[in-house]
Amino acid sequence: MLLLHWDNMGKIELHHVFVMLSCIYLIFSDISINSAVVFLFSSIFFYISFTAGKRLYYLIGIDKENLKINLKKHYNFGIFLMIVGLIAVTSDLIWVKDVPLFNPLSRKFLNVYFTTLSHLFLVGWAIVVASSNIDKKKILLYTIIFSILIMLLGYRTNVLVLLISVGAILYYKNKISNREILKYGILVFVILLGLSILRLYALGVEGNPITSRISLTMSIYDIIFNNFNGVFNGYIHYSAVFSYLGLCNGARTVIAKTLGIYNVSITPTIVGAVIGDYGTLAIIPYFGILGIFLGFFYKLAKDVKGIYLGIYGILFAYTLIGIESGILDIDVILYYFFGLILCIYAILLRKLKR
């Protein structure tokens, strides 16, 4: 009966899942009341902004017929990105001369540029799925196979991005129902749990693979909120970009060193990164702009499909993962900018057609 009721519900959207996951993080954490209230407010404000973005799409009145979507070109572009990503994955494994999945300590020897380029495989496959009519069962089979390939690099995030983005794309193409997306979500959680247990086993560490990570991440956020509120003055997000040019440490490493922790990187949560850089009030413009953009892009992607839906699927995944890790990688930031460019292109094309 519960599954039947689930199928009769409307579409589950990003802002729904964002608030739900944020609440889960709060439930499994032990942080100060003030920081908890701000964290919850951030997710609720994102929810409201996302809804406003959807409304804005209707107010502007995008005509998808004017966009002249060529799904074949989008498909070919996706295949090209997959090839580049596959070459990068192979090169990275050759570079490190080990398999980080089974030896997590070897992950620090991966080539940062190969690793970054390997993410194009995820983007390419998302675009291919969004631009083609491949059978649903084949897509899921290929996705599992590709997940095994990607997880060799030892990053759970990449596997999650692949699984979540494909699930979102199939769901918004109406190829899977509410009931099926629930089952798919459970499968993704089981895979995450398995990878987390494998990582702890390889490191010889004991503990709950899920709640211990949530508790640690939220405690870091709590420390930033109470002791480093606005202290970084934009340096965290500066590091997210310029660390790839060798000008500074990565954003998460900067946070770790500030807290006196060395040889590891630390995830500050998406809220913690913003507050650490710009102060508590910065969550209003940050989540306001992010929510409006993603709400608008969601409606555009759902109507147009192709590369629009492919990129939205990737942003869907990174936004949810960003609750813990923050949006602090240059390639991920570029995906958001690419999505923004697609939105601007659709708006300008409408204006020019008038």
Curated annotation (Swiss-Prot):
Membrane topology category: Multi-pass membrane protein
Record's keyword terms, sorted: Cell membrane, Membrane, Transmembrane, Transmembrane helix
Transmembrane segments: 9-29, 31-51, 76-96, 109-129, 144-164, 185-205, 278-298, 306-326, 327-347
Annotated GO CC locations: plasma membrane
Predominant localisation class: membrane
KW Cell membrane (keyword) present: yes
Coiled-coil region list: none
Localization per Swiss-Prot or TrEMBL: Cell membrane
Keyword Oxidoreductase: no
Domain of life, source organism: Archaea
Protein name: Uncharacterized protein MJ0419
